Amino acid sequence: TVFGSQVAIRGFREQGNGTLYNMLGGSFDGKFLTPGMGVYSSTKASINILTKYLIEENKNTGITIASISPGVLITENWLNEQKKLSRDEWEKQRPVANIICDHVETVAPWIVSEIIKNDKSGVRIAWMSLRKILLRFFKAKVLMQKRDLFSRYGI
C-alpha cells in the first residue's frame, strides 16, 4: 500500500489529478481487538494513518484521496483462519459471524457506486454503519431472522 500509494501519487501529480482509495480493515481504528489478528489489524491501522497523511500532503493538488472500510468480508483468507478453529470455537463464533459478515459480491457493487459518487478527499466509504450492525443484531436476536452465510463453504 505504501509503495503503491507513492507510485500512484507521483503519476497523479504529473498528470495534475487522480483518485486514490486505500482499503481499511481489521480494527483499523483500534476500537475492537480480535485475538490472533494483531499483525493484520496493526497494518490496517497504519494504512489509516498513512491515508490521513496523504490527504493532508496532497491538499489543493487535484488529487482525491479517500478510504474504504468494507466490513468483515468472507474471503479465502478469512475462511482459512476460521478453519483453524476447533469445532467448539467455530460454533461459538458462527452466530455473530453470520450477523456481521458479508460476501464480497454483496458489498462490492455498493462500494463501487459510492466511489463513483465521491469527489472529496478524506471520505471513508464504510459498508457497516453502527445503525446497520444494530439492525442486524435486532433482526437476529429479536425477530429471529437468522442468516446462514457459511453452509456453502462446508463450515
PLM regions: where:
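Functional cleft and adjacent loop/helix regions within the main domain
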Residues: 144-155
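Short alpha-helix in the Rossmann-fold core of NAD(P)-dependent oxidoreductases
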Residues: 1, 5, 43, 100
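C-terminal helical subdomain
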Residues: 67, 85-138, 142-143
